[in-house]
Amino acid sequence: MKNLLDFSLDELGELLKPKFRAKQIYEWIYHKNVDDFLQMKNLPLQMREDLANEFYIGGLNVSKCEQSVDGSKKYLFELKDGKTIESVLLPMKDEITDENGEILRHKRYTICVSSQVGCKIGCAFCLTAKGGFVRNLSAGEIVEQIRLIKKINKIPYERRINVVYMGMGEPLNNLENVAKAIKILIQNEGLAISPRRQTISTSGLSSQIKKLGEMNLGVLLAISLHAVNDELREKLMPINRAYNIASIMQAVREFPIDLRKRVMFEYLVMDGVNDSINDAKTLVRLLNGIKAKVNLIYFNPHIGSKFHRPSEENMIKFQDYLSVHGITCTIRQSKGLDISAACGQLREKNLKEKNDNA
């Protein structure tokens, strides 16, 4: 059987006669959260039965969910083949409350999705790398993470959603399927998520950044930088041997982006590793001439990690130096610290539990 979510609206229209049935199916799935063909009452009964025999919808099941006191939710999804991936729902700080101050709902959410099962980049600080690379996700498996999280949490179709491809995997190592997922998400008949509300985060595959730019998808770009010199970056991120910092900066300068937007540089700050003022000075030089925004991220320690969370004092000094030198800089407010919110933690914990019980 085939995953219907792997098909764009046009592709589905080519399969079905008459073509307008494709729009009806999209509306049932994406607008009404119906994932049982037999419930799609405006389709002929025979078509519903044929669809049920040939397709399935999504193929993800919730294996585990952890909820933080800050409202964040971390999902472990099981795929059709039994493999697992992680996704995170992050409510933004724009909640609507009742007269007692109780949160009724949030105006905006960010959903962090995975693009691969595992990852082949092998970053020293990332738990996902420990399990190695298994396979790419299909476009439908990427889309389903968003659709299912919206359905589970009863997030209305019209509610604003941001999507960040910052979960498990390197999105640009699965560019074909990620690009297709983006196109499906953009469609009004689908979830209608603007490309300007979708951000692809990459470890810096320069050649793939160029390909992404040539696709003209209109999405935002984030670079996982984490070091300001090649020597340190190669230790933290072995991919730097193939794509050094200079090549990344060149690719970023050539990347087409909305004039109102900036390229995000993610900088995971680790105590005594990359948190000095000299690091900040070098970062200012690297970003010269680039319309950039730096997002400083506290390292989230996990079992077996040799890195440590930096002091708040060093984070603020780093941020202040960048700001004084004209670079927009924020410190990411860590969410889900009381749950397994760092990439790969929930999956790793689940695998350990299975092994312990074997």
From Swiss-Prot:
Pfam families: Radical_SAM (PF04055), RlmN_N (PF21016). [4Fe-4S] cluster binds at residues 119, 123, 126. It is found in: Cytoplasm. Its cofactor is [4Fe-4S] cluster. One of its GO terms (cellular component) is cytoplasm. It is an enzyme of class 2 (transferase). Its EC number is 2.1.1.192. Residues 105-338 form the Radical SAM core domain. It catalyses: adenosine(2503) in 23S rRNA + 2 reduced [2Fe-2S]-[ferredoxin] + 2 S-adenosyl-L-methionine = 2-methyladenosine(2503) in 23S rRNA + 5'-deoxyadenosine + L-methionine + 2 oxidized [2Fe-2S]-[ferredoxin] + S-adenosyl-L-homocysteine; adenosine(37) in tRNA + 2 reduced [2Fe-2S]-[ferredoxin] + 2 S-adenosyl-L-methionine = 2-methyladenosine(37) in tRNA + 5'-deoxyadenosine + L-methionine + 2 oxidized [2Fe-2S]-[ferredoxin] + S-adenosyl-L-homocysteine. One of its GO terms (molecular function) is tRNA (adenine(37)-C2)-methyltransferase activity. Disulfide bonds join 112-343. Its main location: cytoplasm. Binds 1 [4Fe-4S] cluster. The cluster is coordinated with 3 cysteines and an exchangeable S-adenosyl-L-methionine. The active site is at residues 86, 343. It comes from the Bacteria. PROSITE patterns: RADICAL_SAM. GO terms for biological process: rRNA base methylation; tRNA methylation. S-adenosyl-L-methionine binds at residues 169-170, 201, 224-226, 300. Keywords: 4Fe-4S, Cytoplasm, Disulfide bond, Iron, Iron-sulfur, Metal-binding, Methyltransferase, rRNA processing, S-adenosyl-L-methionine, Transferase, tRNA processing. Reaction proceeds by a ping-pong mechanism involving intermediate methylation of a conserved cysteine residue. Specifically methylates position 2 of adenine 2503 in 23S rRNA and position 2 of adenine 37 in tRNAs. m2A2503 modification seems to play a crucial role in the proofreading step occurring at the peptidyl transferase center and thus would serve to optimize ribosomal fidelity. Belongs to the radical SAM superfamily. RlmN family. PANTHER family: 23S RRNA METHYLTRANSFERASE, RADICAL SAM CORE DOMAIN-CONTAINING PROTEIN. This is Dual-specificity RNA methyltransferase RlmN. It comes from Campylobacter hominis (strain ATCC BAA-381 / DSM 21671 / CCUG 45161 / LMG 19568 / NCTC 13146 / CH001A).
